[in-house]
Amino acid sequence: MSDSDITFYCLSSILSVLLIFIFILIKRKQAKPKLNLPPGKMGWPFLGETIGYLKPYSATTLGEFMDQHIARYGKIYKSKLFGEPAIVSADAGLNRFILQNEGKLFECSYPRSIGGILGKWSMLVLVGDMHRDMRLISLNFLSHARLRTHLLKEVEKHTRLVISSWKENSTFAAQDEAKKFTFNLMAEHIMSLQPGKIETEKLKKEYVTFMKGVVSAPLNFPGTAYWKALKSRGTILKFIEGKMEERIKRMKEGNENLEEDDLLNWVLKHSNLSTEQILDLILSLLFAGHETSSVSIALAIYFLPGCPQAILQLREEHKEIARAKKQAGETELTWEDYKKMEFTHCVVNETLRLGNVVRFLHRKALKDVRYKGYDIPCGWKVLPVIAAVHLDPLLFDQPQHFNPWRWQNNGNCPNFSGASSNSNNIFLPFGGGPRLCAGSELAKLEMAVFIHHLILNYHWELTDNNDQAFAYPFVDFPKGLQIRVQSHSLI
C-alpha cells in the first residue's frame, strides 16, 4: 500500500469519527429539553444591564430599573449583571428558597473584586466548610450569654461617649457620629483598642479609605478609590499582625492582660487558623461589624423626625425604664431593660425594613434548578433582592411609609398572602439560612441602646431636607445626614 493510500485511509477514519461525534452532539442537544428561562433581556455585550441596575436611587424605593423590570417581566426575570447571565428575584418565596438551600442548590458568589479587597478568607466570600468554621468563631464570640454579660455594657459605654460629646444647638453629620460609635465599639471588642487613642484614630482613618474602595469600581491603578483601598488594606493588615505578634509574645511569657477579653485573644487561644486567615477574619469583621450598623442607626435618626407620634411613644417607653432605674439606684442598662423596649424593637424592625441596608445578595446556581415553572441554569448568577420584598405593597401596607406599629402583635403582617402570616417568612434584613448574619442580635442591640440615650437626652431636627438616604447600591447619605441637636432631660 502506497503512502498516499495510507494517508487517504487515515484522513477518512478521522473524518468519520469526527462526523459521528458531531452527530452525537446534535442528537444530545435535540434530546435535551429547551430551558424555560424567566422573561427579560441581556442588554449590552459584557456589561449587560449592570449600569442601569447600579444607578443611584432613593433608598426607600426600588429605583427606576427594578420598578420597570418588575412591571414588564414580573418578580422573577433574567438579565446580564456584573458580567454574567443572572436571574433576579423580587419574589419572597424564591428568595427564601435560595437562602435555605445554600450549599445545596446555590452558593455565595460575590464579584472577584470584593474578595480582592476583603481577602480570600473573608466570611463574605467564603463558602462551604470554611465559611461554617469562620461563622462558628463569630457566633461563639457573639453568643447570647456574651451579649447579656459583656457586650450590653460595652454598647452603652460607647453610646454615652459619643452622645455626651455633642454640644448644645450644634449641627453635625449624624452618620459620622454613628460610624464613630460602631467603629470604636468593634475596635475594642475585636482588639481592645481604646477610643481616642492615636493608634485607634489612625486605624479609623485607614478604614475610611478602605471602605471607599470596597464600594467603588474595581479599577486598580494609581489614584483610584480601589487602588487607595488596597494600599489601606495593607496598612490595616500590618497593624493587626503587629497586635497579633504582641499577644503571642505575651502569651508565651505568661504576661497576658486579663482586660484583653477580645476576639483576637479568643481566636489565638481557641482556633487553628493561620495568620492569613486570622487577618482576613478580623478585617472583615471590622467591616461587617461597624459599617452596616452605623448606617442603620443613621436611618433611624433620619426616619423618626418624620413620625412625631413614634418619638412620643419612644419617650414614654424610655422614661419609664429610666425612672425605674433611678428608683432602684441603678445607672447601667440591664438585659431586662433591653427586653422592655418593645416599641423600640418595632422602630428597629421598621428602620431595617424601609432602609434596606443590604438590598440584594450575590448567589450562583450549583445545579439546574426549576422554580414556579422557570429554569435557573447551573452556573448562572442569582440575585435575591431583599429590598423588593420589604417594599412590596402586597406584603406590607403602604410600604414606603415609616410605620413602626405594623410590627406590634408579634410582628404579624396582615397583608402577607401565604400559608403563614408571620413576618419571619418575608422579613430578612440579615439574610437567612446558613449564612444568616452572625452579628444580627448585636446590631439590634446597638440600635436600641443608641435610641434609648438619644431619646432621653436630645431633641434633633434634620437641617437639610434634600440630604436623603440613597442606594448606590450601598446606602449612604450624600451630605452625612446633617442634624441640629438640643439637649433635654426626661428624668
From Swiss-Prot:
Subcellular location: Membrane
Keywords: Brassinosteroid biosynthesis, Cholesterol metabolism, Heme, Iron, Lipid biosynthesis, Lipid metabolism, Membrane, Metal-binding, Monooxygenase, Oxidoreductase, Steroid biosynthesis, Steroid metabolism, Sterol metabolism, Transmembrane, Transmembrane helix
Top EC class of this enzyme: oxidoreductase
Highest taxon in the source lineage: Eukaryota
GO cellular component: membrane
Topology of the protein relative to the lipid bilayer: Single-pass membrane protein
Reactions performed catalytically: cholesterol + reduced [NADPH--hemoprotein reductase] + O2 = (22S)-22-hydroxycholesterol + oxidized [NADPH--hemoprotein reductase] + H2O + H(+)
Gene Ontology molecular function: heme binding; iron ion binding; monooxygenase activity; oxidoreductase activity, acting on paired donors, with incorporation or reduction of molecular oxygen
Result of altering F65Y: Mimicking CYP90B50, increased cholesterol 16S,22S-dihydroxylase activity and production of furostanol-type steroid
Alphabetized InterPro entries for the sequence: Cyt_P450, Cyt_P450_CS, Cyt_P450_E_grp-I, Cyt_P450_sf
Outcome (variant: V155S): Mimicking CYP90B50, increased cholesterol 16S,22S-dihydroxylase activity and production of furostanol-type steroid
Keyword Heme belongs to the record: yes
Effect seen on changing R112K: Mimicking CYP90B50, increased cholesterol 16S,22S-dihydroxylase activity and production of furostanol-type steroid
Annotated disulfide bonds: none
Transmembrane stretches, start-end: 6-26
One Pfam entry name: p450
Associated pathway: Steroid metabolism; cholesterol metabolism
Binding-site residues for heme, renumbered to this chain: C437
Enzyme Commission numbers on file: 1.14.14.-
Gene Ontology biological process terms in this record: brassinosteroid biosynthetic process; brassinosteroid homeostasis; cholesterol metabolic process; steroid biosynthetic process
Matching CDD domains: CYP90-like
Tissue: Mainly expressed in leaves and seed pods and, to a lower extent, in flowers and stems.
Task of the protein: Canonical brassinosteroid (BR)-biosynthetic enzyme capable of converting cholesterol to 22S-hydroxycholesterol via sterol-C22 hydroxylation.
Similarity annotation: Belongs to the cytochrome P450 family.
Protein name: Cholesterol 22-monohydroxylase CYP90B51
Organism, scientific name: Trigonella foenum-graecum (Fenugreek)
Gene from which this protein is expressed: CYP90B51
